[in-house]
From Swiss-Prot:
This is Ribonuclease HII. Its cofactor is Mn(2+); Mg(2+). It comes from Edwardsiella ictaluri (strain 93-146). A divalent metal cation binds at D17, E18, D109. Keywords: Cytoplasm, Endonuclease, Hydrolase, Manganese, Metal-binding, Nuclease. Manganese or magnesium. Binds 1 divalent metal ion per monomer in the absence of substrate. May bind a second metal ion after substrate binding.
Length: 197
């Protein structure tokens, strides 16, 4: 972990992260994780810096060893209704609320905290500085990537398994040629243009 983080004086600490703010399709997925100090997990890092194979192995280890963990989400329809930032905050609240044990303190990746019933702190680059946030980023990314692989089987012509819904040249070309699916975010510029909204 680079740029050493000084932990707050608190008993049970949860880390929270999100994946999927930028894609044009699908949910934004969040995770909250409370690690078990008695069962350390080696190699936790920002999910984006890990190979898919390593992420999947760590996902299984986190699920097995964490004191508790929970996923939250906001679907495309909710993102369109609220906006991506507000939908992400709601999804983070859902992840924290879903934890089997209530944390005393929550550390959130980024520079904003959702309203929570316990103390919380935003940590810039938290996914590479705080083990709990790294674990949350891995759970959220593996979950969302698997959802994109499932969507790819449903709509193979869009290439979702390759670009994960992000606005790559391939995705934009397929979107223009084929139109939007029911899973696309209608409030996002490229989708709006295709739909003539």
């Amino acid at each position: 972990m680079s740029d050493i983080f000084v932990y707050p004086c608190a008993g049970r600490i949860a880390g929270v992260d999100e994946v999927g703010r930028g894609p044009l399709v699908g949910a934004v997925v969040t995770a909250a994780v409370i690690l078990d100090p008695a069962r350390p997990i080696a190699g936790l890092a920002d999910s984006k810096k890990l190979s898919e194979k390593r992420r999947n192995a760590l996902y299984d280890e986190i699920v097995e060893k964490a004191l508790c963990w929970s996923l939250g989400r906001a679907e495309a329809e909710e993102i369109d209704r609220l906006n991506i930032l507000q939908a992400t905050m709601v999804a983070m609240q859902r992840a924290v609320a879903g934890l089997a044990r209530q944390p005393d303190f929550v550390l959130i990746d980024g520079n904003r905290c959702p309203a929570l019933p316990m103390a919380a702190q935003a940590v810039v680059k938290g996914d590479s500085r705080v083990a709990e946030i790294s674990a949350a980023s891995i759970l959220a990314k593996v979950t969302r990537d698997r959802e994109m692989a499932a969507l790819d089987r449903q709509y193979p012509e869009y290439g979702f398994a390759r670009h994960k819904g992000y606005p790559t040249a391939l995705h934009l070309e397929r979107l223009a040629a084929l139109g939007a699916t029911e899973h696309h975010r209608r409030s996002f510029g490229p989708v709006k243009r295709v739909l003539g909204l």
